[in-house]
Amino acid sequence: MALVHKLLRGTYILRKFSKPASALYPFLGIRFAEYSSSLQKPVASPGKASSQRKTEGDLQGDHQKEVALDITSSEEKPDVSFDKAIRDEAAYHFRHLKDEIVDHWRGPEGRPLREVLLEQAKVVWQFRGKEDLDKWTVTSDKTIGGRSEVFLKMGKNNQSALLYGTLSSEAPHDGESTRSGYCAMISRIPRGAFERKVSYDWSQFNTLYLRVRGDGRPWMVNIKEDTDFFQRTNQMYSYFMFTRGGPYWQEVKIPFSKFFFSNRGRIRDVQHELPLDKISSIGFTLADKVDGPFFLEIDFIGVFTDPAHTEEFAYENSPELNPRLFK
């Protein structure tokens, strides 16, 4: 046994074989091969040679005693229970599913369902901590080789979100792209129990409500519909938001009837109303072709019911453009 240990700790095998386990497996078996892999280390320095010789001498002197090989120590092989991890994950998702069912019948956050159905305003996103920023993602033309940069952080006193960066309309030098210059902030798609996609239902509201502070640039507000069809992933409903600039906050109210339908960045001739019962995400895009720094500070994003607004859809359709609406 001591001879085996000496072979495993020796520099000859480590020098000749990059994986001693593969070299010793036919002779010593799998348990000793695993042990050899746990002992594989660089060649000892001169300062450590004496301690190594001492260890080898002790083993040679006690060759008649059994050497206990601790191949299952907690440091080398941590105790990981996959069964427990699976049980904990399943229990978490079932608790989440239970909360969804209870909220659907009783009302979110313990409020009566009647009160929820009759509410006139609702804050969907607000920014009071880092966990609120994690619900959003930022992107720019840098993903296609552009030079625009965009960042997102908490504002002053952790009471708002600050979107800032630099816009550059210089096209990438790839021989294909001819236009560039955009920055965007997009909300992440919410997930329910068992990682199901969850959509927002705004069918009882008619207006988007924001409290923002900007630098005078125009932004595009984009709302996406929840869909499982790949062909519709580039479809969205958009409208403009104009910031005033200056140090003061402004309240922006955009009726949902004003949002126009577009696909792959092009406004379609055939227009559709925004399906308010299956909203997937909302985003803000800057692409005004004015190079330079920018910022947009957002306090909250919500929806409310404006009783003075009775318009259902702002855009005209005709039988030639959309015959399905006139059947």
Curated annotation (Swiss-Prot):
Residue segments, region Disordered: 42-63
Xref: Pfam families: CIA30
Alphabetized Gene3D superfamilies for the sequence: Galactose-binding lectin
GO MF annotations in UniProt: unfolded protein binding
Ranges of Basic and acidic residues composition bias in the record: 53-63
Positions of disulphide bridges: none
Gene Ontology biological process terms, A to Z: mitochondrial electron transport, NADH to ubiquinone; mitochondrial respiratory chain complex I assembly
GO CC aspect terms: mitochondrial matrix; mitochondrion
Residue interval of the organelle targeting sequence: 1-24
Signal peptide: none
Localization (cell): Mitochondrion; Mitochondrion matrix
Known role: As part of the MCIA complex, involved in the assembly of the mitochondrial complex I.
Family: Belongs to the CIA30 family.
Record's subunit section: Part of the mitochondrial complex I assembly/MCIA complex that comprises at least the core subunits TMEM126B, NDUFAF1, ECSIT and ACAD9 and complement subunits such as COA1 and TMEM186. Interacts with ECSIT. Interacts with ACAD9. At early stages of complex I assembly, it is found in intermediate subcomplexes that contain different subunits including NDUFB6, NDUFA6, NDUFA9, NDUFS3, NDUFS7, ND1, ND2 and ND3. Interacts with TMEM70 and TMEM242.
Protein's name in the database: Complex I intermediate-associated protein 30, mitochondrial
Organism, scientific name: Pongo pygmaeus
Gene encoding the protein: NDUFAF1
